[in-house]
Amino acid sequence: MPYDPPAMNFDFSGDQKSLREQARKFLAEQSSSTRVRRILEGAAPFDAELWRGMGEMGWLGTAIPEPYGGADFGHLELCVLAEELGRSLAPTPFASTIYLAAEALLLAGTDAQKKRWLPKIAQGAAIGCFAMAEGPHVATPANLTTRAEGGRVSGVKVPVLDGDVADFAVVLAAEGAGGRAGLFLVDVNGTGVTRTPVATVDPTRSHARIVLENAAAEPLGLPGQGWPLAERLLDRAAVLVAFEQVGGAQAALDMAREYALGRFAFGRQIASFQAIKHKLADMYVAIELARSNAYYGAWALSKDAPELPVAAATARVGACEAYYQAAKENIQIHGGMGFTWEFDCHLHYRRAKLTGLMLGSARRWKDLLITRLEAGAA
């Protein structure tokens, strides 16, 4: 009798697809390129009106349990929203607050900490950030200079995504005589905290330099467990950001295809030229591979499966490469016009570059991936 292996379905449900359609319609109206450019060219660090609208839609509480004011849908629904937010280039602190700060509280927070912050997050009344980096080098337990002692934390964190607009920060710091890493909650509106905006390639995602000088801090999670918690947190965020990147890459491909079909040269659509065809085909293949890896990551995240570390790293690497390729080739297909400020091509190029760095570069995640694969094979 022939062996019939069990089928695995990574597709989203009908309700989740309806959520995608609802989100796409809402963001098409509320996060147009005109709105994105308003943040890019203006002084506001994010679109506060859009942020309030997302709160009213219930998106901010998608993965937050009902007892803490959330909708308690789950991470698959959050992945659906992330893809649409990436497609629309939504200029909000969603990633820092939902993928990082809220997830940190859900993973390690006490009931009191969750009750203090999660309802505010779900309502859109609080913004969070994750303060891990201490400069351009890769943060490790051995090179942490930020220190925590006696309920106080001191050090410099830079760059911190949405650190200039956050109400609280989840800070990675060395603690105790042994200097083991721990996570700490810091009210960044309190004393001992100085924040300075940091310019990046994509001003629609604000960053800051945060100086902590004996700032009040409370432990998040068990003492000395900060590094394993940070790794878990980054894995979860990597899957969600991968969906943003896939959404952005698809938007860049759609933009390139539409232009190629509407632009004529020598009496023909430029989409009929082999060089353009191959660029579009390569973009499509890269995006579909990245999407498949992101779907696998979504499954692992929703189940908190043992495969999550490998699935997250795979999704991260594929999405970084696909989005950068799509954003770059979109500019090339547009020709000289693609390099101008007036065309929207550079908006995706900026976002592709930034999302490719904000959780650590694709190169770092490749190193993580091979390390994890080798550990699994041992």
Where are these regions (language model features)?
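Short beta-strand-to-turn element immediately C-terminal to the catalytic PLP-Schiff-base lysine
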Residues: L106-G109, V171-A174, L185-V188, V211-N214, ...
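A short, Trp-centered hydrophobic/proline-enriched beta-strand micro-motif
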Residues: G124-E134
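Alpha-helical interface subdomain recognition
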Residues: P2-L89, A108-Q113, K120, G124-A125, ...
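A generic local secondary-structure boundary/capping motif
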Residues: W117-P119, G135-P136, T145-T146, K157-L161, ...
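N-terminal glycine-rich flavin-associated loop
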Residues: A90-A112
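Flexible, small-/acidic-enriched active-site or ligand-binding loops
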Residues: A139, N143-T145, P159-V160, V188-L222
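Cytochrome P450 C-terminal beta-domain/meander region
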Residues: T140-S154, A305
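A short core secondary-structure module
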Residues: A131, V156-V193
